[in-house]
Regions:
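Alpha-helical transmembrane anchor segments
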Residues: 231-281
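Membrane-associated alpha-helical segments
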Residues: 143-248
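Peripheral, non-transmembrane regulatory/ligand-interaction domains of membrane transport proteins
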Residues: 1-178, 279-280
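Generic intrinsically disordered, low-complexity segments enriched for polar/acidic and small residues
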Residues: 2, 46, 198, 214, ...
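A sequence-composition feature that detects small, non-aromatic residues
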Residues: 10, 60, 80, 202, ...
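A generic membrane alpha-helix/interface feature
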Residues: 41-43, 88, 221, 250, ...
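Alpha-helical transmembrane segments
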Residues: 121, 195, 214, 269-277
């Protein structure tokens, strides 16, 4: 039975010391040390090398980031070396669980390791659904639309990020299929299908809540526009009568009776306009 070694932020010197018994080429060393952009699966007589990506939730920003993981599996000793840089929590949280993986070959190791990853992804979906449900509750109690839309947009972005990462993982599952038994394949396919369905449900749930908020926002905007139109009309009438008053006062210097009459007329007119619009509400 092989051992599992987790190495975080390993430099080239440490890397070469750790894998001194493995005939590892310089190109693979460079890939482990540097950042890569896509999933990769390579095999030779000595080892299997995998570039793999998993999601990590960043509490500070409430976002999901993609974490690159490099796996070097020694075929002669069945030792697995897991290299990762800048991990927020995954390998600290699941170290004991990964250390306990009982494997006699690459197939059993990779099936159990990916199962740990998928289980963590399922927990992320549960958190997203919980957050979205909280947003839904806040929507019904009248929380500010801007905050609701901001929080909901964050959930939608996290769902999209998680969907993209898991889609890439599915490519790896296809590549390792020939190394796993039928039972191991069934286990991974079940977990993968369940996660895909949960992600789809979370996406639809977020979309439904967003549409409800948008509808409410559009209705409120229409009401605000209606109020603004009424207010503008009242201001227009008031401005008109003020201009009329000024004209009368200027032209009628012989007395103030016309001036006060104009004031009374404008006030009554404004009251009439206000009463009219109030009766229309």
């Amino acid at each position: 039975m092989g051992k599992i070694h987790i190495l975080k932020n390993a430099d080239e010197k440490t890397l070469k010391k750790v894998v001194s018994d493995i005939k590892i080429d310089s190109e693979t060393v460079d890939k482990i040390i540097n950042n890569n952009t896509r999933i990769e699966f390579n095999e030779n007589d000595d080892y299997i090398f995998i570039i793999f990506y998993l999601p990590e939730y960043v509490k500070a920003t409430k976002t999901i980031d993609s974490l690159e993981v490099n796996i070097l599996y020694h075929l002669k000793t069945n030792d697995a070396f897991i290299f990762t840089n800048n991990s927020y929590y995954f390998f600290d949280k699941y170290k004991s669980k990964i250390d306990e993986i009982d494997h006699k070959g690459f197939g059993s190791f990779i099936e159990r390791f990916i199962s740990v990853v998928i289980d963590d992804e399922s927990k992320m979906v549960e958190h997203i659904l919980s957050d979205t449900n909280e947003i839904r509750k806040n929507y019904f109690v009248g929380v500010d639309n801007y905050k609701l839309i901001k929080d909901l947009t964050s959930s939608q972005i996290n769902i999209s990020t998680l969907t993209l990462i898991t889609s890439n993982q599915n490519k790896l599952l296809n590549l390792i299929e020939s190394y796993t038994t039928t039972k191991q394949q069934t286990t991974l396919n079940y977990k993968k299908t369940y996660l895909t369905e949960e992600l789809q449900y979370a996406k639809e749930f977020c979309t439904t809540v967003m549409k409800s908020i948008d509808t409410k926002y559009q209705v409120k905007s229409a009401e605000d526009l209606h109020r603004f139109t009424k207010f503008s009309f009242v201001v227009f009438i008031a401005t008109y009568f003020v201009g009329l008053i000024t004209l009368l006062y200027t032209d009628n210097s012989r007395g103030n009776i016309f001036f006060f009459g104009a004031i009374a007329t404008s006030v009554l007119s404004l009251l009439g306009v206000l009463i009219f619009f109030r009766s229309k509400n």
